[in-house]
Amino acid sequence: MKKIVIISGDPNSINSEIIFKSWRKLSKTVKKKIYLISNYKLLKEQFKILGYKAPIEKVDDINESNNTNLKVVNVDLKFKKPFKVNATSTSKFILDSLNLGHKLALDKERVLGLINCSIDKKHLKNKYRGVTEYFADKCK
């Protein structure tokens, strides 16, 4: 079964709320295919603040689990308060997440598609107009 990879995007945004609300509406079949690139601890703390309960599982690889939990491929992130991550850590997290997503998406045998949640473009260091241009540059 091919996987769908979702990049959580900006840690200071409403993306975790969108992810949770969308997750609840998915069928069990689709939930088995989805892997989220994010920071496991950040997501758990954001869900707690928002009052959301979801089964979250930390995985190292997209073939590691095949259940209906929200499977998180962890990307390191230093933070003290969820939704208030400093700009330097946010930029590094976003770029690391995009790079991991790109790497996984190149494996066409295992990955059906890649979805990225919104990011503030300033975290791309004004070198790219957006995520599409960032990925296009990586494919040159």
Briefly describe each language-model feature range.
Residues 1-139:
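Contiguous, glycine/small-aliphatic-enriched amphipathic segments in soluble metabolic enzymes
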